Amino acid sequence: GGYGCLHSALKYPSTFSKVGAFSAGDKADSVFVNDNSTKAKNRILLFGDKDIHNTDYCLTYLADKLIADNKKALAPDIYHACGSLDPWLDMNHIVRDYFLEHNDFYNYTYDELEGLGHEWKFWDIELQKFLDYAGLPVVK
């Protein structure tokens, strides 16, 4: 999803010059409760059972590394979008606020669509906007 897209672009910036990240909250900002649920088990399989801040699983950690290493030339252009009804909107706002604070380093654009959530209608609209942002043709 959106987290994975943004994570890949920040972890491998020499591979990705642009990224479209839709509903891209940082997994490090979600509260982890090991309640033996399927969700908790999947999280442990992916990230382990420890806090993932200050690790390569944390989006802001990866973004800070690019800044610290002065790799602005490699920093991907980021198009980030979320629907106003998305259940993870608050986590997206944390990511948005981070990149807006570092907009002198990152070419960052955020779009929030009113009245849409974590749904195909939102993604279809935003995918077309991202393709335009990236200078790629939109085929209809």
Task: Describe each region flagged by the PLM.
Residues 1-140:
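Non-catalytic cap/lid and distal C-terminal segments of serine-dependent acyl enzymes
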